[in-house]
Regions:
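Mixed-charge (Asp/Glu-Lys/Arg
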Residues: 1-30, 35-136
């Protein structure tokens, strides 16, 4: 799967979870691959598809922080099928950037697959940390 295809799949996943999604242009996106909105809250998302043994570094976090300012987003996230370096985690915490690594992405997919309705508007936990519903 290419990076562009990964971007599109993440966009579909956000839509499945009840978000309006806009894909940004391929070049000149200011560090955001997706702009997602729910209840007028805007979040920018940077997607990074790599080999699973690769670690996403600080540049992805820096890009999405810049993108949040450009797009007027209140929150930002980096989504990857791999993992993050410690430096990226530290920078993300300092800038309130959510990181969605391989394990979080798997949970997110499980929530989307198990959801018969969109996420509750009052959910305390972010959707990517929710426990998937039971399949009994």
């Amino acid at each position: 799967m290419s990076g562009t295809e990964f971007e599109r799949r993440i966009a579909l996943l956000f839509e499945d979870l009840g978000y309006r999604v806009r894909l940004t242009k391929t070049t000149g996106d200011f560090g955001a691959d997706l702009v997602v909105t729910r209840r007028s809250e805007v979040m920018v998302v940077q997607t990074k598809r790599y080999a699973t043994d690769h670690r996403v570094g600080v540049s992805a976090v820096q890009e999405v922080v810049a993108a949040a300012a450009v797009y007027g987003a209140r929150s930002s996230m980096v989504v990857t099928n791999a993992h993050f370096t410690r430096a990226a985690q530290t920078l993300a915490r300092a800038n309130s950037v959510d990181l969605c690594d391989r394990e979080s992405l798997i949970r997110m997919l499980a929530v989307a697959r198990g959801a018969t309705t969109k996420p509750a508007e009052t959910t305390e936990q972010p959707w990517w940390k929710q426990t998937p519903p039971s399949r009994d």
